[in-house]
Amino acid sequence: EFTPAQMFELVDRCEDYPQFLPWCGGADVHQRTDTVTAATLHINYHGIKAHFSTENTKRWPNEMDLRLTDGPFTHLDGHWRFTPLGDTACKVEFSLHYQFSSKLLEKVLGPVFNHIANTFVDSFVKRAAQVYPRA
């Protein structure tokens, strides 16, 4: 339904996340070039607040790697892949690996992050339908 370039653009525009991700309370872009986007995402979900920063290495329009630069984790890394399916569609894949920096944070934020990871791709596909209406 949507091209790799369209989906890549939605993922890269993290400043738009608060418009369609209910858990996202804000986003600050620190740097954006053709190959890197560095940003901080603010989580505000059912009264739980946290933030984390990543540096995302971009290979337009097919891949993006996320690497933690700051936040309540010992590590966090992720990978987006946008694989073309014909001329006008793509397969969207997202993987996220993380470990919280304490058991308490894991207990509080773990369910929130599980929810985020499990609904992330679907949220972007729904957003694409709003941003790129079909002719």
Give the location of each predicted region.
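Soluble, non-transmembrane catalytic domains of enzymes that act on hydrophobic metabolites at membranes
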Residues: 4, 23, 28-31, 36-40, ...
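Glycine-rich portal/gate segments that line the openings of hydrophobic small-molecule binding cavities
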Residues: 18, 28-70, 123, 127
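Beta-strand/loop substructures that line and gate deep hydrophobic ligand-binding cavities in soluble
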Residues: 68-119
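Hydrophobic ligand-binding cavity/cleft-lining segments
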Residues: 1-34, 130, 134
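Short amphipathic alpha-helical signal-transduction/dimerization elements
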Residues: 15, 113, 117, 121, ...
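Short, surface-exposed helix/turn micro-motifs that flank interaction/cofactor sites
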Residues: 8-12, 83, 125
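Short strand-connecting beta-turns/loops that link adjacent beta-strands
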Residues: 3, 32-35, 61, 85-89
